[in-house]
Amino acid sequence: INNWNVSRCSYMSYMFDGCCSFNQPLDKWDVRNVKTMGYMFTNCSKFNQPLNEWDVKKCENMELMFAECHNFNQPLNTWDVSNVETMEGMFFDNRSFNQNIS
C-alpha cells in the first residue's frame, strides 16, 4: 500500500484503527492535503514505521493519532504542526515513544 496514490485524500481518520498487526511502510504517501488524521493509528500496537517525510502542514486534527501504538518510536521533528487544532491524546498509552518533538 506504500505505492497508493492518496494525494487527493483529505480525511484519514480511523484508517488503521485497531489493526493490531499492521506494520507496513507508508513513507511514500503524499499526505499534503489531509486535514484530519485523528485516530489514524489507534491500537496499531506493532506499527513502527518512519513518517518523518510526511507533509502534514494542512492537518488540523491529530487527536489520538498514535494512541496505544505501543511500539511506535519514530522521529516526527520535521512535521509542521502549526495548523493542528487538536492533538488531544495523540500519544496516549504509547509506551515506546521517546522522540524529540520540539
Please identify what each model-predicted range represents.
Residues 1-102:
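Negatively charged
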